Amino acid sequence: IGYSVLEKPIYCLKIGTGPRQVFYSGAIHANEWICSNMLMKFVEELCIANNKNSSLFGYNIRNLLHKTSIYICPMVNPDGVDLLNGELNLNSNEYRYARYIANKYPNVPFPNGWKANINGVDLNLQFPAGWENAKKIKFSQGITSPAPRDFVGNKPLAEPEALALYNFTLTNKFELILA
């Protein structure tokens, strides 16, 4: 559906052919990377149940997938997840910049407390709905520049990950969105 700051693809899987649309997203915060694994396990279980024409949680999955299209974006913030899980090169400019940001917040463990994308922007606070209010709250708390968590950014949808997610939701008619 788009690319991260470091140009890593942000993938979305579609399972089902039905007109009703449901969307799941995971790892919008770097320290919520476990959600990606959980969503991929959910995909695996859906596919197995569909192939076997069996039930999952009391629902016949084949029937469900004829009525519903399930979209799953397992990892919205791949750069942040890579930072948190030690996949970024410690000598890279991106890692050094993240370390520089983190040093301003000694109470947030680095990298384990990192929620933001690689630019130090909290992607969950990047959407237009309520952005001005979130900015007011976070700025009053002293979070006015890139940070490991809670920086709203300089304007809504400034970060490519948030913009990709926003545009993707606009191009579909989701009845339910779970993040």
Task: For each feature predicted by the language model, list its residue ranges.
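Acidic/histidine-rich, surface-exposed loop or edge segments in extracytoplasmic proteins
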Residues: 24-26, 148
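Soluble metallo-hydrolase cores and metallopeptidase-like ectodomains found primarily
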Residues: 1-22
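Conserved phosphate/anionic-ligand binding catalytic regions in large, soluble enzymes, centered on
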Residues: 29
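Active-site/substrate-binding loop(s) of hydrolase catalytic cores
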Residues: 19, 33-37, 41-179
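Pocket-edge structural micro-motifs
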Residues: 2, 14, 26, 74, ...
